[in-house]
Amino acid sequence: MNRYRLTVEFDGRNFMGWQRQKHGATIQGSIEEAGASIAGQPTPVQAAGRTDAGVHGLAMTAHIDVARDFTPFRLMEALNARLKPRPIAILSCEQVDPEWHARFSCIGRRYLYRIINRRPPLTLEAGRAWHVIKPLDAETMDIAAKRLIGLHDFTTFRSVHCQSKSPVKTLDHLDVRRIGDQIEITAAARSFLHHQVRSMVGCLVLVGQGQWTADDMTTALEARNRAALGFNAPPDGLYFTQAIY
């Protein structure tokens, strides 16, 4: 069995998320179907992260197992041909050791959350960013974001459906910056809880709108209670940007 490392870009708007589902289109399912049509047998795919419905990928790392021999370039070209017209692209492909695993070998993950902060409706960015009309103070948001960095119990920022054994995670990086009418929030950690990034972003927007202070963010964190959460940001603005090995 040959294992290939893939870098995958995708527009998550019309998918049920990364993970294969019994009903509905998914990124994993689409790539496995494309691989099976090339190899003539199942081609299991695993990824560094499992994104939700509507979440996008700029550079998701995955691996695919193929029994037949392909050069990486030929496999990449064949997968891309069969993935059309779905908004999924294999950006790179390389053969790796069969023991290497896209998920379990990963030591860090990075996400980007994009907010368009303006009154006019979104056109080109619709479904690819969160449209927030009320003005946001990015500097205040960044100050509050720093309250979350470090080793914490993130129960408040964890989905009730999260399957992680422990709510304790180390958040290595959380940064907020404004570029024109766009606000970019970047987050990095070894791993994240289900909905953790979107939950943190939702609370940061409350801070940016003046409804919360940085102290309120700390209070929510220390509550270790989902009821203390402001709200979840929508999936539209979330992008998986990098897996670190």
UniProtKB/Swiss-Prot annotation:
Active site feature: 52
Molecular function in Gene Ontology: RNA binding; tRNA pseudouridine(38-40) synthase activity
Source organism, top-level taxon: Bacteria
Catalyzed reaction equations: uridine(38/39/40) in tRNA = pseudouridine(38/39/40) in tRNA
Pfam family, one: PseudoU_synth_1
Record flagged with keyword Isomerase: yes
Keywords: Isomerase, tRNA processing
Entry keyword Isomerase: yes
Residues binding substrate: 111
CDD domains: PseudoU_synth_EcTruA
EC code: 5.4.99.12
GO annotation terms (biological process): tRNA pseudouridine synthesis
Subunit structure: Homodimer.
Family per similarity comment: Belongs to the tRNA pseudouridine synthase TruA family.
Listed HAMAP family: TruA (MF_00171)
NCBIfam families reported in the protein's UniProt record: hisT_truA
Biological function: Formation of pseudouridine at positions 38, 39 and 40 in the anticodon stem and loop of transfer RNAs.
Protein's name in the database: tRNA pseudouridine synthase A
Species classification: Bacteria, Pseudomonadati, Pseudomonadota, Alphaproteobacteria, Sphingomonadales
Designated gene of the protein: truA
